[in-house]
Amino acid sequence: MAVHIALHEIGVPFEAKPMSFQRKDMKSPEYLALNPEGAVPMMQIDGRPLTQVAACLFYLAKRYPEAKLLPAGDVETEAQAISWMSFIASGIHPVARLGGEHVANAWAIAERKFGDGEWALGRYSIVDIHLFRLYWRMKHRPNPASGFPRLDGLYARMMARPAVKRTIEIESKIGYELPS
């Protein structure tokens, strides 16, 4: 979902191929021939697989700088983006399956880290896209963690973005397993 949002923000054409976790599509011989990791998302760039949400988003932001999804020429902010992306991948994503207190603690850290602005880096970026994707999934699970006004604000701002609306609309039509 996050990679699709970024692609819609950038405005480049792409072909999405839905993958089902329930059918174990990522473990099929055809998919493993393209991507030995068997991971999603996966982008093919010049015939080579690029996996992991953070890597795909970083690639898109650097490949299409005109979209301004990563501050150009600002090493400190770029390092903050990498810090955020690492935290999301290692501090939030793995605990999503654990539920309960683990999830609440991870989101409490994200809430404090977010600060008082509208966007994680002070302006809209790949960090907001990545953070939103996991927060969106959490909010659509039974008994979601709550009490995160900054992240709720991010959620509302993201849901208002045309790229997010378009992504949700398209992914629901192609059969992507979206939470209800």
Task: Locate the predicted segments by residue.
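Terminal-tail/helix-coil boundary detector
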Residues: 167-180
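Short Asp/Glu-rich motifs
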Residues: 25-27, 157, 177-178
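Flexible loop residues that form catalytic
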Residues: 48, 134, 172
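Short, solvent-exposed turn/loop segments enriched in Gly/Ser/Thr/Pro and often Arg
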Residues: 20, 126, 171-172
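GST-like domain detector, emphasizing the conserved glutathione-binding G-site
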Residues: 1-101, 105, 111, 120
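GST-like fold's C-terminal all-alpha helical module
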Residues: 76, 84-167
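Residue-level detector of family-conserved "landmark" positions at structurally sensitive sites
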Residues: 17, 53, 148, 168-169
